[in-house]
């Protein structure tokens, strides 16, 4: 009997501990707009000093090595006397954090593996296709089972200081793929050449099946549902007002505020969507006090305490 994509043991490829990841948030709630569109809201923990950005950033820092390298790469680096984490961090080069998309892509990876339980099949070091060290195509390619259905996921990430700009930019990127088979075909054509060595942990027959399924003209590709997950970090200005008021129970007040606006935010996203068919959308929404500040902190943690120096 011929094996199906959904019968592959995708869980054995997951690297993100979902329990540890979820524990970083004080808010984890979903707004189901429709069967095709799910919008999930997450909030970091808060105290009188503000949001606990550094705990979250240190977590993504520790996850970087499995994001950038597969197990074979890591093993070879250790054998050659290198520290894999140091090598992984070199991917996050000396680039202005206010414009660098790498941190958002890393967070997207964590959300997709933890929430949707679908592993990344092309590691980041292999996705760097051109001389500018920037990535063409989506911000991540994943495969797994969602609701018992084999699913191919092409992700996007945006971090903006304005909610409406963030949503607009994310949807503009997603439109490259939504109902556009040629874009998916180009993405998979490149991905086939850079598949994670971790896939070799599966059976050999599984590998052949996966490779065939990434050819859009083959019958195996038809087994997939197509999902477009998007991570959106945006500034929610009123959070800072709550913190500045310096009242007790700051975290509960922040949560009350975020819960009060999530339906309005979800409605805006839903009304902004293009017409979709035969696909699903997953939005991971992460409102913060200030996106620019969060980006700067990411750079500092990933560069051993160094702040990014801009030309004056």
Which residues does each predicted region cover?
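A short, highly charged nucleic-acid-interacting micro-segment common to nuclease
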Residues: 88-109
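Conserved catalytic cores of phosphodiester-cleaving nucleases, focusing on short active-site segments
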Residues: 112, 139-142, 152-159
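Short, solvent-exposed loop/turn segments that connect beta-strands within catalytic domains
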Residues: 146-150
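Acidic, metal/cofactor-coordinating or nucleic-acid-engaging core segments within structured domains
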Residues: 168-255
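Extended, charged low-complexity segments
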Residues: 244-312
């Amino acid at each position: 009997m011929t094996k199906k994509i959904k019968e592959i043991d995708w869980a054995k490829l997951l690297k993100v501990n979902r329990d540890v990841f979820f524990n970083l948030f004080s808010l984890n709630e979903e707004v189901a707009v429709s069967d095709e569109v799910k919008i999930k809201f997450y909030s970091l923990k808060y105290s009188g000093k503000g949001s606990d950005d550094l705990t979250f950033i240190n977590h993504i820092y520790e996850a970087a090595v499995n994001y950038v390298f597969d197990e074979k790469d890591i093993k070879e680096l250790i054998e050659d006397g290198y520290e894999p984490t140091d090598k992984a961090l070199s991917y996050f080069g000396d680039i202005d954090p206010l414009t660098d998309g790498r941190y958002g892509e890393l967070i997207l990876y964590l959300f997709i593996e933890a929430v949707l339980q679908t592993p990344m099949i092309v590691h980041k070091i292999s996705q760097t296709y051109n001389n500018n060290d920037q990535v063409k195509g989506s911000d991540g390619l994943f495969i797994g089972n969602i609701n018992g259905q084999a699913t191919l996921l092409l992700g996007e990430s945006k971090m903006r200081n304005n909610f409406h700009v963030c949503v607009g930019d994310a949807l503009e990127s997603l439109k490259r793929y939504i109902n556009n088979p040629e874009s998916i075909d180009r993405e998979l054509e490149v991905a086939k050449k850079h598949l994670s060595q971790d896939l070799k942990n599966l059976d050999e027959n599984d590998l052949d099946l996966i490779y065939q399924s990434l050819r859009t003209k083959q019958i195996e590709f038809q087994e997939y549902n197509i999902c477009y997950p998007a991570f959106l970090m945006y500034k929610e200005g009123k959070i800072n007002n709550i913190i500045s008021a310096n009242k007790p129970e700051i975290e509960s007040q922040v949560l009350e505020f975020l819960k009060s606006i999530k339906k309005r935010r979800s409605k805006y996203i839903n009304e902004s969507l293009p017409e979709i068919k035969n696909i699903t959308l997953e939005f991971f929404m992460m409102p913060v006090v200030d996106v620019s500040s969060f980006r700067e902190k990411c750079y500092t943690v990933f560069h051993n305490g160094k702040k990014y120096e801009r030309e004056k």
